Design a protein with these regions (language model features):
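Anionic coordination/interaction segments
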Residues: 1-285
C-alpha cells in the first residue's frame, strides 16, 4: 500500500480530510468555512478571519497580512493551568504540546491537542443557513487528579471596512463601541450612527470575567503571544470606548479525572431593518 504520510501530514481519504501533524508548517495551511453568506478562513494554528458576504466591506475580525510572525491574529483560546499557558492550535503562545493534530475537512476544521494530561478538541464550522461561526471546545482531564484551570477566548474585531480599518488610524482610535450582557459581547461600532448591523461573540457558560479593550487584555508591554491578562489569570471587565476592540471571555473550569466539558462559542453577524432598529428616539435595540 502506498504511504500517504508526508513531512507535515497526510490525506485521510476515508474522512475526506487533510490531517496536519505539526503546527510548524512552512506557511499557514488554510481551510475555508461557509457556503452561503457567512465565511471564515482558518489556518492550522487557528489564525484567520470571518466576514459576511464581502471580505472588504463586512469584515468581522481583523487579520494583518504582513504580521511578524505570519498568521498571528485569529480566533484563539488560551488555556491556563497553573503557570502553564497553551493554545489548542499551538499559536499564539507557541507552548510545546504533548500532542497536536489539525484536521482540515469539508467545511470544518478540528484541532486535537494536549498538554499535561489535559486534552483539548476544538472544532470550527459555519452552519448552513446561519450567519455565524461556531467553535466547540471540549476539554478532558486524562489525569488521575482533579484539574482547575481557566480558558480565555480572544478575537479582535474589525471596524467592518478592512481597508479603512488598516489605514485610517487616527479615526479608528475614536470609533470602537461595545456592549456586554452576561456571556455575550456585542460589537456595535457605528451601529447607532450609520450602520444597521453588528457582530456578537457569546459562549454557552457563565463567565468569570471579560475584556473588550485590546490594550487592557494584552497590557502595555504584553503581546498576543504573552497577554498580561492571561498570565495574571484575572480579566479587567473592560468596556472599550474607542481604541482596538476585542472579545474575550474568561471561564474557570474544574474537571475530575476522566471528566469532560464542552464550551460552545458563537461569533455572528446580525442585521436589523432600519425601521426596526430603534425602541424609541435615541434608544437602539
Amino acid at each position: 500500500m502506498e504511504d500517504t504520510h508526508m513531512k507535515f501530514g497526510y490525506f485521510d481519504d476515508a474522512n475526506k480530510e487533510y490531517v496536519i501533524t505539526s503546527p510548524k508548517t512552512p506557511l499557514p495551511w488554510i481551510n475555508y468555512l461557509g457556503s452561503e453568506n457567512f465565511f471564515s478562513l482558518i489556518s492550522n494554528t487557528c489564525g484567520g478571519y470571518s466576514f459576511y458576504k464581502d471580505a472588504k466591506l463586512l469584515r468581522l475580525t481583523r487579520y494583518r497580512y504582513n504580521n511578524v510572525p505570519f498568521d498571528s491574529n485569529g480566533h484563539y483560546y488560551y488555556i491556563k493551568e497553573g503557570d502553564t499557558i497553551w493554545n489548542p492550535g499551538w499559536m499564539p503562545a507557541k507552548t510545546d504540546l504533548d500532542a497536536y493534530e489539525c484536521h482540515h475537512g469539508m467545511g470544518y476544521s478540528t484541532f486535537r491537542s494536549s498538554k499535561n494530561d489535559l486534552q483539548a478538541e476544538l472544532t470550527a464550522f459555519v452552519p448552513v443557513g446561519k450567519n455565524c461561526e461556531i467553535n466547540q471546545l471540549t476539554l478532558t482531564n486524562n489525569s488521575k487528579e482533579t484539574k482547575d484551570f481557566s480558558v480565555f477566548s480572544y478575537v479582535e474585531f474589525c471596524f467592518w471596512n478592512a481597508v479603512d480599518d488598516s489605514t485610517n488610524f487616527q479615526r479608528n482610535l475614536s470609533l470602537g463601541e461595545v456592549e456586554v450582557e452576561e456571556s455575550t459581547i456585542y460589537h456595535k461600532t457605528e451601529y447607532r450612527e450609520r450602520r444597521n448591523h453588528f457582530a456578537y461573540y457569546t459562549v454557552n457558560s457563565p463567565v468569570a470575567g471579560f475584556d473588550t479593550s485590546r490594550d487592557d487584555f494584552l497590557g502595555v508591554y504584553g503581546s498576543i503571544e504573552h497577554p498580561e491578562t492571561v498570565y495574571a489569570g484575572i480579566s479587567h471587565n473592560s468596556v472599550a470606548s474607542g481604541g482596538a476592540v476585542i472579545g474575550s471571555h474568561h471561564l474557570k473550569l474544574t474537571l475530575k479525572p476522566g471528566e469532560s466539558k464542552s464550551l460552545i462559542f458563537v461569533l455572528g453577524y446580525s442585521e436589523n431593518d432600519p425601521e426596526d432598529k430603534w425602541e424609541a428616539p435615541g434608544i437602539i435595540k
